[in-house]
Amino acid sequence: MRRTFAIGDIHGCSSLLAELLKRISPDPQGDTLVILGDFINRGPDSRGTVELLLELKRQFRHLILLRGNHEQMLLDYLDGRHQGLFLAVGGRETLASYGADPAAVASTSWLPPEHLALLADLPTCYENEHGIYVHAGLQPGVHLTGQSPEWLLWARDDFIRSNHDFGKRVIFGHTPFADPLVTANRIGIDTGAVYGGRLTCLLLPELKFVSVAATGSYSWGRHQR
């Protein structure tokens, strides 16, 4: 059975991602690596994070990069929508990592084409024998194929508090916890790396957690979008 390594929200903490990958050492040919979205914003090195993801894409046969709400907000920003929201929730840090001016809303020239192509073509969910993987959560009682982007990218309490059986465990990020949340129907692995917590990987089927502790905090509060 192929192992799956699932990694929570990175938020521009590229050095933590690099260190975590060294610790878990997944097999690029045999293992599946799933990263649950929110690669960018808030942290110091969104550009370096995307560059590392592109390198992983070249290395791994089974790499799944999921869309998070922050990738969606970047795409909206580039499309001229919700610009203030993007900048307020860490977009300024992303732009700074690319050496870009927040005033250059209408232009994508600051974003390398390979980076834009990766960020614009991310699925919102993935399923394998070990579980269902999403950024934020699922709407109880709705089949996976009928889930809305609002739930997949933005869900919080209504999903987290639900006892609904989704058929498989749901592996998710988005909502930070001090330690991974483990229940019968879901596992939350956002452990607040950008807030001074940890970047966490879940190894399946072993149900083992591996984390790298942050050395500082790059954002002032939790549960902001």
Task: Annotate each predicted stretch with a short phrase.
Residues 3, 7, 12-85:
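Core catalytic region of metal-dependent phosphoesterases/phosphodiesterases
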Residues 27, 87-199, 204-225:
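Acidic, His/Gly-enriched loop-helix segments that form or flank divalent-metal centers
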